[in-house]
Amino acid sequence: MWGYIHLISWVAIVVLTVTALLIYSKSTKSFTMLQMINRVFYILVILSGIMMVKYSIEQSWILAIFKILMGIIVIGVVEMLLSYRKQQKPTGMFLMIFVIVVVITISLGFYLSGGYPLFN
């Protein structure tokens, strides 16, 4: 169950972040609302990650710690990306870092979980 919550929350964070970046020029109110919803999903990701960490540590404790750090970095990069967008500063570098870090984090997550919940 926690795997599904974790996966759905990560997908929601990515979708909300991309949506917020795309609609900023049209509606700052909607941008702020999406940013707040994103923060709720951060809490879900952190809680579900805590519940699943014991299974990841059984697989490889070094990779589990690395994945935890990468997850924290993703949240930080998303916050920086959205705050730079709100301040109308260039976001290209953070967007590139966001894509790279998300791909690494997702890959580690599926490796440590043995593909669960998508590839049972």
Swiss-Prot record:
Q: Which InterPro entries match?
A: UPF0344 (IPR010899)
This protein's major location comes to: membrane
Q: Extract the Pfam families matched here.
A: DUF1516
Q: Where in the cell is it found?
A: Cell membrane
Q: Where are the transmembrane segments?
A: 3-23, 33-53, 62-82, 92-112
Q: Which keywords has UniProt assigned to this entry? A: Cell membrane, Membrane, Transmembrane, Transmembrane helix
Name it: UPF0344 protein Lm4b_02292
Q: Which organism encodes this protein?
A: Listeria monocytogenes serotype 4b (strain CLIP80459)
